[in-house]
């Protein structure tokens, strides 16, 4: 690594921390309450890694497979330099397509984290239903085997794909799984009736605590293409309205939900008292991870770039612009105007650092 690479990366990190610190000073108290009977806690810092899509035999395209292992390794090293991280949440699509060998590779890196890390599965974390999508030289795991492989990182010996954890008194984590591993065509999602009832029960029983909700798929849409019937509708839940209804009913206890899957820059929407975040992908442009600080009163964030070379980041941006499917329908053809519109959605640079009340 040359001095220019190092100084640029350190400048971005230091600048991001300075802005985040300002946001925290403005919006966070030392202890705050959700209600007079709520459990107080000091602000908590945590990180989110999403859509690493690690592939030990891949080539760079829209998904930067050839450097995917390096992206995880560098991100782990950078997160280990963050101060006072309570945990790291990995919000699905750890693998390219359910390969055991890729699972071993990413776990090797994640196990180097000094903060505890928790995992939930995405639609690429189990064996493809269609044998044509299975590559020679790899062995494949079912979603049940994925859960067992990452047992102890959120998953328990029960084998259930969803779970809750107590982070500290007053703060809990709820991980949901809407994947459809036996669906032969769609890569979308739906939360089972059992899981929806469980979620409602969890939030009812912990109404005086703050519950952070995580899921790979999205509760809300981020572009017109994701509406029902659109070419990207499966980025969201089939029964998103049912899930949002439960969260809205418990908005005081579950004011924040964070998803991955969409591969765009960090963004949020507030719906009926709940703030829904989308976390950026580690493996495709803009190749970022996220660090949050939360209290009962507010949430602040930064989304640093993965610490790979400038040439890697430029290649990732060019590969995104070449990937026609990933472009919005109205900007499908490349032009200066259309390319700028595509990058605006995927980079969302105005949200690299920010904060909001919850």
What are these regions (language model features)?
Residues 1-22:
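N-terminal secretory signal peptides and thylakoid transit peptides that target proteins
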Residues 30-103:
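N-terminal active-site segment of His-dependent metallophosphoesterases
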Residues 40, 296-358:
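A short C-terminal boundary segment appended to hydrolase-like catalytic domains
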Residues 43-56, 171-180, 214, 275-280, ...:
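Active-site-proximal beta-strand elements of phosphoester/diester hydrolases
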Residues 55-58, 96-100, 123-131, 181-184, ...:
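Active-site environment of divalent metal-dependent phosphoester hydrolases
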Residues 77-87, 172-174, 186-275, 331-332, ...:
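His/acidic metal-ligating clusters that form di-metal
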Residues 100-200, 270-276, 287-291:
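Extended active-site neighborhood of metal-dependent phosphoesterases/phosphodiesterases
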Residues 256, 260-309:
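Active-site/pore-lining binding-face segments in mid-to-C-terminal subdomains
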């Amino acid at each position: 690594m040359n001095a220019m690479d190092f100084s640029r990366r350190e400048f971005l990190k230091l600048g991001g921390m300075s802005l985040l610190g300002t946001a925290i000073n403005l919006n966070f108290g030392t202890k705050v309450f959700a209600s007079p009977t709520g459990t107080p806690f000091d602000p908590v810092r945590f990180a989110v890694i999403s859509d690493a899509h690690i592939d030990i035999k891949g080539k760079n395209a829209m998904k930067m497979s050839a450097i995917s292992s390096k992206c995880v390794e560098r991100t782990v090293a950078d997160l280990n330099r963050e101060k006072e991280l309570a945990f790291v949440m990995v919000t699905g699509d750890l693998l390219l397509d359910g390969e055991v060998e890729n699972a071993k590779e990413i776990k090797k890196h994640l196990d180097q984290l000094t903060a505890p890390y928790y995992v939930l599965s995405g639609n690429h974390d189990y064996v493809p239903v269609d044998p044509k999508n299975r590559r020679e030289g790899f062995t494949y795991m079912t979603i049940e085997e994925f859960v067992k492989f990452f047992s102890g990182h959120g998953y328990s010996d029960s084998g259930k794909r969803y779970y809750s954890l107590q982070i500290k008194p007053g703060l809990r984590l709820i991980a949901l799984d809407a994947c459809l591993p036996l669906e032969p065509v769609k890569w979308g999602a739906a939360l089972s009736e059992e899981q929806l009832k469980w979620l409602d029960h969890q939030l009812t029983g912990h109404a005086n605590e703050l519950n952070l909700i995580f899921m790979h798929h999205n509760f809300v849409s981020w572009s017109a293409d994701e509406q029902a019937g659109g070419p990207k509708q499966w980025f969201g839940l089939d029964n998103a309205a049912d899930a949002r209804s439960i969260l809205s009913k418990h908005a005081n206890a579950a004011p924040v939900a964070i998803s991955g899957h969409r591969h765009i820059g960090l963004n949020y929407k507030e719906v009926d008292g709940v703030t829904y975040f989308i976390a950026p992908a580690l493996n495709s442009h803009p190749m970022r991870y996220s660090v949050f600080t939360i209290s009962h009163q507010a949430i602040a964030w930064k989304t640093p770039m993965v610490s790979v070379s400038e040439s890697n980041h430029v290649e990732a941006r060019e590969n995104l612009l070449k990937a026609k499917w990933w472009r919005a329908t109205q900007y499908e053809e490349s032009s200066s105007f259309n390319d700028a519109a595509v990058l605006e959605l995927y980079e969302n640079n105005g949200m690299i650092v920010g904060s909001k009340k919850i």
